[in-house]
Each structure stands twice: as structure tokens, then as C-alpha cells.
Design a protein with these regions (language model features):
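Short amphipathic alpha-helical segments enriched in hydrophobics
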Residues: 36, 40-47, 87, 174, ...
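Anion-binding and metal-coordination hotspots
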Residues: 78, 83, 96-100, 108-566
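Short arginine-rich
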Residues: 90-94
Length: 566
């Protein structure tokens, strides 16, 4: 498909007349067209199309239709019908009343071009640029960030079900690609074992019988992989995606006991000694959650658990403005695998906001985003104040009523000496590494600690040892903890709660918490378009002068908050 740029023409007279007659008091889409114009043009989408070929549908209109579709949570077919039938859509798109629209498949093709071209952020960024030009958005204010879980567009499977489904997927792929080869190499029993889905399989109860069942599945998969990788097998069979995925899942789910470790067969018994396929348990070890494939139908979904919520899928992070003198607009969206910690996306979010020229002055976040390194890096790299509760101290000294915590020690960073509450100085101060991060380890002498009258409040070990972060991180964390104890902290931090309402609105109105598509890139596109659609709705409300809704309170709560009568 090639792009033939379509000029953003005026609204046809007939369309405008009918729309004004149908909506004499205005409409959100009419208002958006009158105030913001067409929002998009064809130029930013030109790199996504070839220079030759059949003319493509107008991309600026497809972008706008995509936002409307997500704003109203419509399917492709219903969105295409709305283009043909709804006068407010025709007004916003600048179409004639008689315009027949386009086939619903065009929307899927357009999203595919955005993903293939790495342009997932284009729709949101273009809208934000327009808002900056219209003075509806400004940098260096307050912004807030929060995340929520996203269920993948696949059924949740446990490890055994995932192994069975992966083998079934490989067999189905080979049955279509190489039916004669598969019939020649398949075990006759496989037809009964793997004809139905994994949840239909009869898994026997009991740990031992369940492991034996899993290892039978492992032997079947190992047999198939051995046949595929045999020298006489067609080389292209190894390149079938389902076969490669089978290999990866078998590595994470099973291990091989070498043939020499397998007891020799009894004399006269036929056959050759083969490696023993063993189901991986805690003793054998298996990959961390970030590498563990959880479904053969979306290899990028991952398992995660946060407090009482467990899910297979992704996690989405939304950042929005929260200044009182403008609309609250989402400025950045990040979709990650489910196990990725919140604070790991903070640096990337700040870099993306810096590229857009939309960095905040104060960034309100919850405790999951706050760490000593993040406090320093945000201020040093982007001049952003990270504002939120700090990580808690879980050492027993902090939990005890009168224990001596790190705050009770005086630190002389220049002389590299720590002084304990009893006045004793440390004997050793040295740099070290812990989980890839620089730390300072401080040790006191056992000769000072053992006879100390305060030892019971300080340590249960022979001597007290401290683990410090580098000076900049340590001082930033201590300053943030001191700030957290001030009365003004709670008042300022209250502003962060509004982003939870944004997540709630996205979940209820746009199904934000359920992935529509397979794969991380397409799910990221879904979330970016959802954010842009939410911005479109908020802009319409702001232009109409609709005030922000206040937190709902019951009649009883309002009554009890009123001052008592004298």
C-alpha cells in the first residue's frame, strides 16, 4: 500500500448543517473538531507506507477513528459502522453524509503498520504536541504515576498445563506443515494424549503419580525434538516457531539425567539406555519469573504476584498531569512484562518525558517507585523531585521499640568512620558490591561490642555491622524519610491518589486491564491508544467547561463532616 496524502479539508456543508441540527447544544466530537481541528495529518504516518502500490486509506482519519474506537470500547466492525452511520463522527472526520466509509479490516491493518514501524507512541505524542501548542499542557508542573496488572489474552496455565499445551501446539503446527513426516514419527498413543486441551487431560492425584505423568509428557516432547533435530529430518522443521518454542519450554520444565547415570537394563532386556527425562522441581531449579514462558500462544506473557493478586500477563504504567489550572492529560504509557518492578521503569519514563519536553518538576508516586537510587537519579539527570513514601526498614532493630537503627549512628563520610550510640568507632569501612549495586560495609570490633551494655538493643551477633548505600543515595533517602514525617507531606501526597481514578476509568470504560492482542508490542499499542482516547475525552470535557468531579461521599459521610450545631 502507498500513501496518497489527503488534505485536511473543511467540513462539508451538508454534514455541518445536519450535525448542528442534530446537536443544537453541541457535542464532544463537534467541539473537538471546532477547537482542535483534525488533530492528525498524513505526514507523520508517511514512513509507514511504501512509495508504490495501491492507494491506502487516509491515515489521519484512521488514526482519529482508532481513538474514537478505543474511547467507546468498540470492535473494529462496530467502529467501521459508526463511521458510516454517526453524524458526530462524520463531522469530526470531515466526511460527506454519503461517504461509505471503509472495511473493518483496514483498522487492523493500520494498527499492524504502527507496530511494524515502531510507531506505537505516535498517536499519543501527536495529541500531546497539539495540546502544548494550544497551551493546554505545560512542562515542569506536577505529574503522578501508578501501575496496574493486565491479563494476557490467553488462558492462565500452570507449569504442567503449559508443557502439555506447548507440545499440542507443536504437534498441530507440524500436522499442518509436514503431515506425512509427523505421521511417520508420531507415537500412536499421542493421538489420545494430546487430542484435547490441557485442562481436559486427566492428571492423577498425588505428588508421585503427578510427577510420573509430567515425565511421560517430557519423554514425548523429547522424542519429538529428537526426531526434528535428527540429521535425516528436513532442516526447516527446526525453524517452525512452535517447535522452537517447544524446545525452550522443555529446557525450563525438564532436565535430562545422562544415560550413564541411568541403571543398566536387566540382562536379556531389549532396547538401548536413553537419558531419563525428569520434571523440574525446586531441587532441580527453574527459571525466574521474568524468563519463564507461561503460555505457548503468547510467549511474552509472564506470571507475577503482588500481595494477594496473581496473574499471567503484563503491567501498565500511566503518568498524567495533575495541575489544577489545566486538563489532567496522560503524558506517558509504559507496558512491561508482569514481574518487572515499578521502580525499574522510572528512568525510562523520565527519558521519554524529556524527549517530549514534558518533564515534571514534582513526580508523585507510591512506594513501589521510590528508592535511594531513583531519588538521586531523578534529581541529577532530569531535575525532577521524586515525591512519595520511602522503603520501610525491615531490620529487627527498626521493629523493636528501643532498637538502634542506622539513624542512631553518626557517619563521618570524609574520614570513613561510623560512631555507634555508645560512642565506639567502627573498625573497618570498605566498598563492596551487592546485587550489582555499590554498597559500603561498616564493621565494629567485637572487643567493643561484646562488653557493651547496649548490645541487646543493637545486635544479636558477635558485632554490629552496617550496610550503607553510597553517600549521595544515603543522604537522599534520609532526607526523603525526614520529609515524610512532616505534616505538609500528607497534604501534598494526597494529589497522587487521583491517578488511581484514572486507572479505574480505563479499566471500566476501555477494558485497560485485559489485553486485546497477543504480544507485548501490540499490548503496548493498545495501552497507548487507550491513553490517547482518554485524553481526547478529557479534552472534550475541559473545552466544554465541565469541572473535575469530586470524590463521592455518602449522605451520612457528608452529614458527619458538617460542624455540629451550637
Amino acid at each position: 500500500m502507498s500513501l496518497r496524502p489527503t488534505p485536511c479539508a473543511d467540513i462539508p456543508a451538508n454534514t455541518a448543517a445536519v450535525a448542528r441540527a442534530a446537536f443544537p447544544k453541541g457535542n464532544v466530537y463537534l467541539r473537538l473538531r471546532d477547537e482542535l481541528g483534525t488533530i492528525f495529518t498524513d505526514a507523520p504516518f508517511a514512513p509507514l507506507f511504501a512509495s508504490r502500490g495501491q492507494p491506502a486509506a487516509c491515515p489521519w482519519r484512521l488514526a482519529l477513528v482508532t481513538l474514537l474506537q478505543f474511547a467507546e470500547n468498540l470492535s473494529d466492525r462496530r467502529a467501521a459502522e459508526a463511521v458510516r452511520s454517526r453524524i458526530d463522527w462524520k463531522y469530526l472526520l470531515g466526511l460527506e453524509l454519503t461517504d461509505p466509509g471503509f472495511d473493518a479490516s483496514v483498522l487492523s491493518e493500520f494498527r499492524g503498520r504502527l507496530v511494524a514501524g515502531g510507531a506505537e507512541q505516535l498517536l499519543l505524542d501527536t495529541l500531546l504536541t497539539l495540546c502544548r501548542e494550544r497551551k493546554l499542557l505545560r512542562p515542569r508542573g506536577r505529574q503522578r504515576t501508578d501501575s496496574t496488572h493486565v491479563l494476557g489474552a490467553v488462558r492462565g496455565l500452570n507449569r504442567l498445563e503449559c508443557a502439555i499445551e506447548t507440545l499440542r501446539a507443536a504437534l498441530n503446527a507440524l500436522a499442518s506443515a509436514a503431515p506425512d513426516w509427523l505421521r511417520a514419527h508420531a507415537d500412536p498413543d499421542w493421538g489420545e494424549r494430546y487430542a484435547g486441551r490441557a485442562e481436559e487431560a486427566h492428571v492423577p492425584p498425588g505428588e508421585a503419580t503427578r510427577r510420573a505423568f509430567a515425565e511421560q509428557v517430557g519423554r514425548d516432547g523429547h522424542h519429538l525434538l529428537a526426531a526434528v533435530t535428527a540429521p535425516e529430518a528436513p532442516i526447516w522443521l527446526r525453524e517452525v516457531p512452535a517447535v522452537e518454542l517447544l524446545r525452550r519450554v522443555w529446557v525450563q520444565s525438564f532436565c535430562l539425567v545422562p544415560a550413564e547415570a541411568v541403571p543398566a537394563p536387566t540382562p536379556g532386556a531389549p532396547g538401548q539406555v536413553e537419558p531419563l527425562v525428569r520434571w523440574r522441581g525446586e531441587a532441580e531449579g527453574f527459571p525466574a519469573a521474568l524468563q519463564l514462558i507461561s503460555s505457548p500462544y503468547d510467549p511474552e506473557v509472564r506470571y507475577a504476584k503482588k500481595r494477594t493478586t496473581a496473574w499471567i500477563g503484563y503491567k501498565v504504567h500511566l503518568t498524567e498531569t495533575c495541575d489544577e489550572d489545566g486538563p489532567h492529560l496522560i503524558t506517558h504509557v509504559a507496558t512491561t512484562p508482569a514481574p518487572v518492578a515499578d521502580r525499574e521503569v522510572l528512568a525510562g519514563g523520565h527519558e521519554a518525558l524529556a524527549a517530549k519536553g514534558l518533564l515534571p518538576d514534582t513526580h508523585l508516586v507510591d512506594a513501589g517507585y521510590v528508592g535511594a537510587h531513583e531519588l538521586v537519579a531523578s534529581r541529577r539527570d532530569h531535575d525532577v523531585t521524586l515525591f512519595g513514601p520511602t522503603p520501610k526498614d525491615h531490620h529487627w532493630q527498626a521493629q523493636a521499640e528501643n532498637g538502634f537503627t542506622l539513624r542512631d549512628f553518626r557517619l563521618d563520610w570524609e574520614r570513613e568512620i561510623a560512631t555507634c550510640p555508645a560512642g565506639q568507632r567502627s573498625g573497618r569501612w570498605r566498598l563492596d558490591q551487592r546485587r550489582g549495586h555499590a554498597v559500603v560495609k561498616v564493621r565494629f570490633s567485637a572487643r567493643d561490642c561484646q562488653p557493651c551494655a547496649l548490645k541487646a538493643r543493637c545486635t544479636h551477633a558477635e558485632r554490629r555491622e552496617l550496610m550503607l548505600q553510597p553517600r549521595a543515595e544515603h543522604e537522599a533517602l534520609e532526607a526523603a524519610r525526614a520529609r515524610e514525617g512532616e505534616a505538609a507531606f500528607a497534604q501534598e501526597y494526597r494529589r497522587r491518589a487521583g491517578v488511581e481514578g484514572t486507572l479505574s476509568a480505563g479499566v471500566r470504560a476501555q477494558a485497560l486491564r485485559r489485553a486485546r492482542y497477543i504480544g507485548l508490542a501490540k499490548t503496548q499499542l493498545q495501552h497507548v491508544v487507550t491513553a490517547a482516547a482518554m485524553n481526547l475525552v478529557r479534552l472534550g470535557a475541559w473545552l466544554a467547561g465541565t469541572p473535575l468531579a469530586r470524590t463521592r461521599q455518602s449522605a451520612f459521610a457528608r452529614l458527619m463532616l458538617q460542624p455540629a450545631c451550637a
